[in-house]
Amino acid sequence: MKEIKAIIRPAKLPLLREKLRSIEGFPGMTVSKVEGCSAPSLQSPANLKEELTDYTPKIRIEIVAPDEVCNSIVDTIVDNARVGQMGDGLIWVTDIERAVFLYKTVPGATGR
């Protein structure tokens, strides 16, 4: 299992959601409104103060998915959320040691 997190531009969410849902085996996602700024080293000195004090609205997507669909999900995010400018966002993938889906779990069956 993998956890895929992405920070994207809000305007990209509707199309991205549609494309992700068309992936066979797509498990669903959690979407949150967040704010962020680019790294200071990526900014010109003229824009640095404004960029560090004026956060930009973004969307964070979180997906827990089987390994088999991870690359398809990441590729779909890149293909549909990128505009080629600073501030496009970020994607990161981490290993999940264990995931317990509440609706599938029998009480007491998790080995606590």
Region annotations inferred by a language model:
Residues 1-112:
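Positively charged, small/polar-rich N-terminal and surface patches that mediate targeting and assembly
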